[in-house]
Amino acid sequence: MARTIPLERVRNIGIAAHIDAGKTTTTERILFYSGVVHKMGEVHEGTAVTDWMAQERERGITITAAAISTSWLDHRINIIDTPGHVDFTIEVERSMRVLDGVIAVFCSVGGVQPQSETVWRQAERYQVPRIAFINKMDRTGADFFKVYGQIRDRLRANAVPIQVPVGRESDFHGLVDLVAMKTYLYTNDLGTDIQVSDEIPEEVQDLVAEYREKLLEAVAETDEALMEKYLEQLEGGEALTEEEIRHSLRQGTIKGLIVPVICGSSFKNRGVQRLLDAVVDYLPAPTEVPPIKGVLPDGEEGVRYADDDAPLSALAFKVMADPYGRLTFVRVYSGVLQKGSYIYNATKNKKERISRLIVLKSDERIEVEELRAGDLGAALGLKDTLTGDTICDEANSIILESLYIPEPVISVAVEPKTKQDMEKLSKALQSLSEEDPTFRVSIDSETNQTVIAGMGELHLEILVDRMLREFKVEANIGAPQVAYRETIRKSIRTEGKFIRQSGGKGQYGHVVIELEPGEPGSGFEFVSKIVGGSVPKEYINPAEQGMKEACESGVIAGYPLIDVKATLVDGSYHEVDSSEMAFKIAGSMAIKNGVTKASPVLLEPMMKVEVEVPEDFIGNVIGDLNSRRGQIEGQETDQSQSIAKVVAKVPLATMFGYATDIRSKTQGRGVFSMEFSHYEEVPRSVAETIIAKSKGN
């Protein structure tokens, strides 16, 4: 089956932002104007097309990255609407991994918020080109240029307005396109009657002149040939054409040198068609982004170009239980994925058969025969393929770069309300953990309780809610527990020697390691410096495995050991008695012996907390954060709205129930956001209490 839309006319984009910036409403309007839906859905009414989980419709927040296909100006646009709540960071992370461009939505009143910064960092990590859409221009306090300044200063982006709004706040009724130098005025509520003219309204003429000049400067700086022409224009030479500006702006955006900034009000149906034009004009096709990299079977780096005739390579970026069956969402990078075909999962070294392929219009599933290079869709029939796995041709195997998956920071014990539900609970937990890699399930070895871990209170709340709704399991939930960790502060040399003689064949394994503190965030790092065969090659891996397993339980309070580096420097073996198991045990002993002498300390997760409150309450809030062992890092006041903002680093252990506390301390007018920052040493007095508790004292 031939390709119906050329690859150059495909756009894979995400819509990402802070919670309440208006992402889902923006997606709804895009679907309305591009003809996918014929009636607008509203988030606050619970009718949005992309919010199709029951909890999303109730809470008015988008939890899972819904993938939808639409068309505009003969281009196919595949859209992923991502959640703005920090507890669902993995959804943003996995969508960034498979996108070619992003619309970053900002509220024209709230501006750059903490989650805007998180999303921006994720887009930076994957080098995804961006357009900034400053939304809610009709709101009281809306300020396009203030938010544009925040994008430049706080996100350090080379943001360049390519539009200027016409009218302020409730009078916002149009915009001037600085590339085409045309005015667009909206004359009806649906935003479908638009007056287009070459005349610039008098009240914005000075602003238009100022920002048109900034736009020309910015595009000229990304293109030497254009810079010459621009300098000649300043001296009375030929002016830059609209095509030249558009072309350079496109190239600058794709290379990440420029972020075009546009404005609108999705709720009031203003500016959405121009946003779609900008997606087509400035965001890249799959052929315009760097080829995807991966590892070939021989360990060398390989690349796959976006081409239907190249060998198949695709990444599974999400797994979801669905009434249809188990959906595995994939992004095809090269080649063609066909319904009914056998695929090779290079990550798992397994073959599987795809029974059906579908593309989504949110609730609606449309069956297709194939997915081609650059396509996003979902496969049914894959039982072993999980998030981050590579699907490819067995004859042309490659393992693509996977996703960055953050560690969970909070855990709770969970048990079914009735014994009969035990089996249903374990099925539910398995299904949910397959869908969400930041959701972990384990069994506490001492209490034998089932423990679930995630990214925050809301994350776990929603997962427990889903257990009840989708799997009909009622569960009792314990109090939240903090994911403490242990590490070392001193470098030492230590050894592990395992010898067992009990008649017949004995056991012998001996390793000498240098144990030292690792880089923050490095986890466990192993290096072998064995020369001369004091430890045979076949025993090095088992020794490393033993060390890794020993790190799963530290010596102070049994929490996992992180940020340590172990270098294998020496050892000895026995021709007959040595075995892989003996060296695995010796490796484990070396870590346990060494850690006790290497000044072990307890670490706790620190959260970046941002609180916004009316000025009158700021003293109370700062005092409260200090009492929670918080470190205040910054404070600013928006005089125009009498709102104060505080940024602090606070231990997660002291933040449980903060949502209720902040409401009572600010008469319900305070809002806050919280995300994981880093691990930090627990003060000794606090550590003693935690250690005593872990030992049951």
Curated annotation (Swiss-Prot):
Pfam families in the record: EFG_C, EFG_III, EFG_IV, GTP_EFTU, GTP_EFTU_D2
GO biological process terms, semicolon-separated: ribosome disassembly
InterPro entries with a match to the protein in the record: EFG_II, EFG_III, EFG_III/V, EFG_IV, EFG_V, EFG_V-like, EFTu-like_2, G_TR_CS
GO MF term (any one): GTP binding
CDD domains listed in its UniProt record: EF-G, EFG_III, EFG_mtEFG1_IV, EFG_mtEFG_C, EFG_mtEFG_II
Gene3D superfamilies listed in its UniProt record: 3.30.230.10, 3.30.70.240, Elongation Factor G (Translational Gtpase), domain 3, P-loop containing nucleotide triphosphate hydrolases, Translation factors
Keywords assigned by UniProt, alphabetized: Cytoplasm, Elongation factor, GTP-binding, Nucleotide-binding, Protein biosynthesis
Binding positions for GTP per the UniProt entry: 17-24, 81-85, 135-138
Domain of life of the native organism: Bacteria
Subcellular location: Cytoplasm
Domain tr-type G as annotated: residue spans: 8-287
GO CC, any one term: cytoplasm
Main location: cytoplasm
HAMAP family: EF_G_EF_2_B
Function: Catalyzes the GTP-dependent ribosomal translocation step during translation elongation. During this step, the ribosome changes from the pre-translocational (PRE) to the post-translocational (POST) state as the newly formed A-site-bound peptidyl-tRNA and P-site-bound deacylated tRNA move to the P and E sites, respectively. Catalyzes the coordinated movement of the two tRNA molecules, the mRNA and conformational changes in the ribosome.
Family to which the UniProt record says this protein belongs: Belongs to the TRAFAC class translation factor GTPase superfamily. Classic translation factor GTPase family. EF-G/EF-2 subfamily.
Protein name (Swiss-Prot/TrEMBL): Elongation factor G
Gene: fusA
